[in-house]
Amino acid sequence: MRFIFFLSFPLYLLDRATKYLVLGHIKPDGPRVVVPNFFHLVNITNTGAAFGSFKNNNAFFIGISCIALLFALVLLLGQSKSGKAASLWWTRDIWRDVSLALLLAGVLGNLTDRLLYGHVIDFLLFDLHVPFAHPWPAFNVADACICIAVVCFIIHSFRQEKRVTEAAQL
């Protein structure tokens, strides 16, 4: 549990600090070029979810964020009644714990924005020069934490599947 706190809390603070700096130093109409034709720092308000989808649903996303936080905390603090791992969700390993720590940091970071400002502050803008995303939608540290959490949980699920398959072959 300490590991999760020591990963989540600094990432949450990094998200808050970077958004604070963006609000103080980057105007909404004045992007800062970091790497020409590739990376800019911007100040964009996002009232929706990923890629700006489902705009103007702040109350809905506050509710979803609270459910996600509760879900992650139950997984971190709970255990199956028998004390053994009953499913993929309860099976602890480093990938699951990292994914939950990142999820907590990301969800809490964006939830804080929604509660304080009524929207999420996005500021990292990459132009990947691909036709379907030119430029790639702006995002923030919390969004990156959530995306990496999903990847870590997928790795966790494949590792658990492999363990179940190996156990069945014995």
Predicted features along the sequence, with ranges:
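Alpha-helical transmembrane bundles and membrane-interface segments of multipass inner-membrane proteins
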Residues: M1-L170
